[in-house]
């Protein structure tokens, strides 16, 4: 068993976005998954991007946002709100915009794991 204290969790951030690295190969013996909690402030955007060799599952836990997708070469959008679940296969383009008035929160499960440090400007551990 592993137990990770909240004080040991790395928090990555960009303007309006915080990503809590709950479980990953840096703080766990698990080599199969990265689990994060992401907070997106009102008006903030996570730009469209992809993960070439990892699938990702997002579980919306609070608020309402807009998925920024690219399906068959066409940029599309889809409402994503608390209770919804979405799975992105390897290479699926995805992002998120918070058009709501409150913080949007989701849990992300990524396999195989990714070190998301490359995508964020700040870390509470650096």
Which residue ranges define each predicted feature?
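A short, N-terminal "cap"/entry segment at the start of jelly-roll beta-barrel domains
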Residues: 1-33, 47, 121-126
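Conserved hydrophobic/aromatic beta-strand scaffold that supports enzyme active sites
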Residues: 19, 35-39, 57, 77, ...
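Short strand-connecting beta-turns/loops that link adjacent beta-strands
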Residues: 27-28, 53, 72, 101-102
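Conserved short histidine dyad/triad with adjacent acidic residue
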Residues: 36-52
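Residue-level recognition of conserved beta-strand positions in structured domain cores
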Residues: 37, 50, 61, 69-71, ...
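Histidine-centered metal-chelating micro-motifs
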Residues: 45-47, 66, 85-86, 90-96
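A short beta-strand-loop-beta hairpin characteristic of the jelly-roll/cupin
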Residues: 55-82, 97
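Ligand-binding loop in jelly-roll beta-barrel domains
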Residues: 81-82, 90-116
């Amino acid at each position: 068993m592993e137990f990770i204290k909240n004080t040991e969790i790395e928090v990555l951030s960009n303007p309006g976005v915080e990503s809590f690295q709950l479980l990953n190969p840096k703080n766990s013996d698990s080599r199969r998954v990265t689990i994060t909690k992401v907070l997106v402030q009102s008006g903030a955007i996570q730009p469209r991007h992809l993960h070439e060799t990892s699938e990702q599952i997002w579980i919306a836990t609070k608020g309402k946002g807009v998925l920024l997708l690219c399906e068959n070469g066409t940029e599309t959008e889809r409402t994503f709100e608390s209770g919804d679940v979405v799975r992105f296969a390897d290479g699926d383009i995805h992002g998120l915009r918070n058009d709501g008035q409150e913080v949007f929160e989701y849990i992300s499960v990524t396999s195989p794991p990714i070190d998301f440090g490359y995508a964020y400007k700040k870390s509470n551990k650096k």
